[in-house]
A protein has these predicted regions:
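Active-site HxH/HxHxD metal-binding segment of metal-dependent hydrolases
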Residues: 55-108
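Conserved beta-strand hairpin/beta-sheet module of binuclear metal-dependent hydrolase folds
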Residues: 2-57
Length: 108
């Protein structure tokens, strides 16, 4: 993990699978609340790296907001685990509708 600008931290998750591009995790650490942009895939390895980043920055998940840029699983995969720890997640309503429409297409 490195601080790329004051209070903005970046961790890159690389994969051995050449078909998977690296994932960048960003956290903006604030005094009262912190902001994470996207999460990553829902894998144990990604969770360990992401949780390690949060812990290293001394962030309480109850004071963490997550902004989801779009509905792909490599951006949303770890949201449920973070919500279980008290984090709040936000996503553009258009992306939320896409996710619901996608779910409905699978159920139709």
């Amino acid at each position: 993990m490195r601080e790329i600008k004051k209070h903005i931290f970046l961790e890159t998750i690389s994969y051995e699978n050449r078909h998977m591009s690296p994932r960048n995790l960003y956290i903006i650490r604030g005094e009262e609340r912190s902001l994470m942009v996207d999460t990553s895939n829902n894998t144990e390895r990604d969770w360990t790296i992401l949780k390690g980043m949060i812990d290293a920055l001394g962030i309480d998940c109850r004071k963490l907001d997550i902004f989801i840029t779009h509905e792909h699983p490599d951006h949303t995969g770890l949201v449920p685990k973070l919500q279980e720890l008290g984090a709040r997640a936000f996503m553009n309503p258009d992306e939320t509708r896409k996710r619901v429409d996608l779910l409905h297409s699978y159920l139709a």
